Amino acid sequence: MKTKNFFTVMAAAAALFLSAALPSAASDTKVGTDGAAFMKIPTGSPRAQAMGNNGVSLAEGGEAMGINPAGIASAQMREVSYANMSWFQEYSGQYLSYVHPIGQSVVGINLGYYGIDGFDVRDSEGKPQYGADVKVRNGYTSLAIAKGFFLEKLLIGVSAKQVLEDNYTTEYKNLVFDLGVILRIGRKLSLGWAGQNFSGKKHQVVKVNRLGGAYAFNPFMTLALEQKTYSDRKGRLGGGVEFSLPEEVLQVGRVSVRAGYSPADNLGKNLDDKSLGSLGLSDISGWSFGVGLYSAQALGYGMGFDYTLAPYGSLGKASQLALRFQF
């Protein structure tokens, strides 16, 4: 039936949806040729997302598992974190993680789930199929272990990850692996590298390589630079900055303001989202902004809140909110 055939086409479109939405250079002819494009999204780390998706040398605790597994080695306490991510065209996701120090090592487990609500399905003539129950489900779960060496100057982590991509007509399941390293030089400079999604079937899970560094000029300002290379896209250099008022200054907690940039195409102007217009971001793409609050004293536990907003021109905006608790 032509309707069923068109569902197949729509499923393929869903598989490429994120690749189209994620910024890409026009000259990159391989963009979208690898699956599980949702693995490019820094779900679970609004901090890294706010700094232009640059966090390979900075990520710590549960947020590190989706960026650089070595980062969980810095955890001194047990930590639970939850994040809610909103992407384009009703695409959204949730993230949950838990890290636990054991002796000289730290283990962590996380779960990420993504889906599309109200997916627009039409037949070959373009007529809406309101009764069609088309679901697009993406997700992953991983188990990580990391350890610090030389008084926490060198952090090494590895994780095994099961990735699911269900595009209605086709379902892919892949076991992949991540490896990461963070090297801290003195108190101000840190370097990081992470390779993600290795050993998956060819082209079914996009592979990611991150290489970057961060420099803390003082307790108030940190600058990060990072080169990200995907198996279906050329590498790009991005950067981000974080301004913080330490807890020692405010007495009640640390407040951070963040901004970052990664090169992106001109995605046009958004005429529908009034919030972007009021902020002067309706024709901005590539930039991201965020805030963070953290207190080591709240109710006797460590508590953190992070929020990020990333405009993408005519496509709309992405946002992410995360909470974490340390005990």
Regions inferred by a protein language model and the residue ranges of each:
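Subset of outer-membrane beta-barrel
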Residues: 27-327
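Cleavable N-terminal export/targeting peptides
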Residues: 1-38
